[in-house]
């Protein structure tokens, strides 16, 4: 590992550790997303507590946390495998942010942002897959899982040299969603737009 690659990995983690959801909610004087709703500091929970505009702002900021370091590494000619580590570092920062007591989100938006520099065609395929699954089934977690499982295949079809880094990133996202997988099989996973029906639902972790 070169010093440049190591520097980009550290930068990616620190950038990922900036919790967009928490900061935007503070600016808009909304409740801390870590304490209400699903208690997940991501766009899905912010949509629930703050509406569409706040959620879109969080989504875009979370995506940029993945795009900026990976794009930077891409233009600095960092090899594909190391770019995968940069992307993973950004997502780990989002999931376990050092600036916010290591309590972060699921990393889906940040992962999408990290994949974006590979190509607009890949980004469009990934986003279309997520949207179709959400529209058909209304499970954001299912959409995220289906999307990340297909993302390595899409990458192989478009730019095969990035298949391994994308697969590494997708494995991290799947592992982060293990509780969602359990709830999907149990039939207890909340759908997009549903409100919490009881206090225990606050313990649920949503995606994005």
From Swiss-Prot:
Compartments where found: Cell inner membrane
Membrane topology of the entry: Multi-pass membrane protein
TM segment ranges: 4-24, 56-76, 80-100, 117-137, 139-159
Tree of life domain: Bacteria
Coiled coil: none
EC number per UniProt: 2.3.1.275
GO molecular function, one term: acyl-phosphate glycerol-3-phosphate acyltransferase activity
Enzyme class: transferase
HAMAP family, alphabetized: PlsY
Pathway assignment: Lipid metabolism; phospholipid metabolism
Function, as annotated: Catalyzes the transfer of an acyl group from acyl-phosphate (acyl-PO(4)) to glycerol-3-phosphate (G3P) to form lysophosphatidic acid (LPA). This enzyme utilizes acyl-phosphate as fatty acyl donor, but not acyl-CoA or acyl-ACP.
UniProt keyword annotations, A-Z: Cell inner membrane, Cell membrane, Lipid biosynthesis, Lipid metabolism, Membrane, Phospholipid biosynthesis, Phospholipid metabolism, Transferase, Transmembrane, Transmembrane helix
Cellular-component GO terms for this entry: plasma membrane
UniProt-listed Pfam families: G3P_acyltransf
Xref: InterPro entries: G3P_acylTferase_PlsY
Reactions catalysed, as given in the entry: an acyl phosphate + sn-glycerol 3-phosphate = a 1-acyl-sn-glycero-3-phosphate + phosphate
Protein name per Swiss-Prot or TrEMBL: Glycerol-3-phosphate acyltransferase
Family named by the database record: Belongs to the PlsY family.
GO annotation (BP), single: phospholipid biosynthetic process
Assembly with partners or alone: Probably interacts with PlsX.
């Amino acid at each position: 590992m070169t010093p440049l690659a190591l520097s980009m990995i550290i930068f990616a983690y620190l950038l990922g550790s900036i919790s967009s959801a928490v900061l935007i909610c503070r600016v808009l004087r909304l409740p801390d997303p870590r304490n209400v709703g699903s208690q997940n500091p991501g766009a899905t929970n912010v949509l629930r507590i703050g509406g569409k505009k706040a959620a879109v702002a969080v989504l875009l900021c979370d995506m940029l946390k993945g795009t900026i370091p990976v794009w930077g590494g891409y233009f600095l000619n960092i090899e594909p495998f190391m770019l995968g580590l940069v992307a993973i570092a950004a997502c780990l920062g989002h999931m376990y942010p050092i600036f916010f007591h290591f309590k972060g989100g699921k990393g889906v938006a940040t992962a999408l942002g990290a994949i974006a520099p590979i190509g607009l065609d890949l980004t469009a395929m990934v986003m279309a897959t997520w949207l179709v699954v959400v529209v058909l089934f209304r499970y954001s977690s299912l959409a995220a899982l289906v999307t990340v499982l297909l993302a390595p295949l899409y990458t192989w079809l478009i730019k095969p040299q990035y298949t391994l880094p994308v697969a590494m990133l997708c494995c991290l996202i799947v592992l982060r969603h293990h509780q969602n997988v359990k709830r999907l099989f149990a039939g207890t996973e909340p759908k997009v737009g549903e409100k919490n029906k009881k206090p225990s639902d606050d313990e649920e972790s949503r995606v994005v």
